[in-house]
Amino acid sequence: MNALYNHAVKQKKLLEQELNRFELGVAAPVGLQGSISTALVGLERTIEQYQAQVAQTGSGAEAGKHAQRVGELTECAASARRRFEGLRAASMQPVAFQSGAAAPEGAVSQRAAGARTTINSAGGLPLYEGLRREQNMLARGNARLDSILQMGQESLEDMVEQHRILQRVAERMQGSLRTLGVSDATIERIGRRVKKDKAIFWSSLTLLVVGVYYVLRIFG
C-alpha cells in the first residue's frame, strides 16, 4: 500500500506542476491541457487502487492511517480537477480580454489594421482571409492532437482496468488454492507469475506515457 501511496503523491506533484504552467500562461496549448487531463485520470485510478487495498486491510490503526490518506488524496484530486476546469474556462476568453484592454488605443489600432489590410490586399490575400486560413490549420492540428490524446487516455484506462482484474483474479486464486490445501511453494510460484504480469503491465504503461510525452512535445 505504501508503494501505491508514494506513486499517488508523485502523480499529484507532477499534476500540480502542470497546473502551475497552465496558470502562468492561461492561453496554454491544447497539448498541455491534454497532458493535465491524462495526469488527472492517472491520479484518480491510482487512488481507486489504493482505496481498494485499504478496504481489504480491515480495521486498526494502520488501516485508519491509510484511510485518512485516501481521503486527503481524493480531496486533492477533486480540487485539481476544479482548478483545471476553471483555468480551461478562462483560456476560452483571451481574445475578448485583450480586445477590452486595447480599447483606449482604438484610433491607432484602426490605422494599423488598415495598413496591414492594404499590404495583404496588394499581395492578393486580405488579412482576414489569412487569419481564417491560419485558424483552420490550427483547428485541424488541435483536432488531430485531441484524437491522439483521447486514444492514449482510453488505452491507459483499459490497461488500468486489466491490472485491477488481474489483481482480483490473483487474490481469488490464492484463496481457492489455500482452501484446497495447495502447498505454499505452489502458491509462491503463482505469485511470481503474477509479478511478471505486473511487470509487463507497468512496462506497457511506461511506454504509453513516454509515447504521449513525445506526442505532446512534437505537437504541443
Swiss-Prot record:
Q: Provide Cytoplasmic-side residue ranges.
A: 1-198
Q: Which residues lie on this side of the membrane: Vesicular?
A: 220
Q: Its principal location?
A: Golgi
* InterPro entries documented for this protein: GOSR2/Membrin/Bos1
Spans traversing the lipid bilayer = 199-219
A single BP term in Gene Ontology: endoplasmic reticulum to Golgi vesicle-mediated transport
The record, for Gene3D superfamilies, names: 1.20.5.110
Q: What Gene Ontology terms describe what this protein does at the molecular function level?
A: SNAP receptor activity; SNARE binding
**Keyword Transport attributed:** yes
- GO annotation, cellular component aspect: endoplasmic reticulum membrane; ER to Golgi transport vesicle membrane; Golgi apparatus; Golgi membrane; late endosome membrane; SNARE complex
What's its membrane topology? Single-pass type IV membrane protein
- Give its localization: Golgi apparatus membrane; Endoplasmic reticulum membrane
The record, for Pfam families, names: V-SNARE_C (PF12352)
Q: Which UniProt keywords apply?
A: Endoplasmic reticulum, ER-Golgi transport, Golgi apparatus, Membrane, Protein transport, Transmembrane, Transmembrane helix, Transport
**Family membership:** Belongs to the BOS1 family.
Task: Give a short account of what the protein does.
Answer: SNARE required for protein transport between the ER and the Golgi complex.
Q: What name has this protein been given in UniProt?
A: Protein transport protein BOS1
Lineage of this protein's species?
Answer: Eukaryota, Fungi, Dikarya, Ascomycota, Saccharomycotina
